[in-house]
A protein has these predicted regions:
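Positively charged, small/polar-rich N-terminal and surface patches that mediate targeting and assembly
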Residues: 1-86
């Protein structure tokens, strides 16, 4: 299992959330701030199986295409050692 952490600008968060939902991914959104100007950003957390990582990244690429050197999302894919729902 993997945890995908995605950081996007506030203005892109709704579009990406809708795209994840339409593609049967469950996402948790956390409001946060960051960057040089402390602008509003949203951090999204997705827990996915190893086989779903590429599909989740494709959703990001398709929903938020980069324009030139301007990238619209920062992604981290990290292993999950233990997952439990209580």
């Amino acid at each position: 299992m993997k945890m995908i952490i995605i950081i996007v600008k506030d203005g892109d968060a709704d579009t990406l959330t809708q795209s994840f939902t339409a593609n049967n991914f469950r996402v948790t959104r956390v409001a946060s701030t960051g960057g040089f100007m402390r602008s509003g950003v949203v951090t999204m957390l997705l827990g996915v199986e190893d086989t779903q990582v590429d599909a989740a990244i494709k959703v990001v690429r398709d929903s938020l295409p980069a324009s030139g050197d301007d990238k619209r999302a920062t992604l981290f894919v990290v292993p999950v050692q233990h997952f439990e729902q209580v």
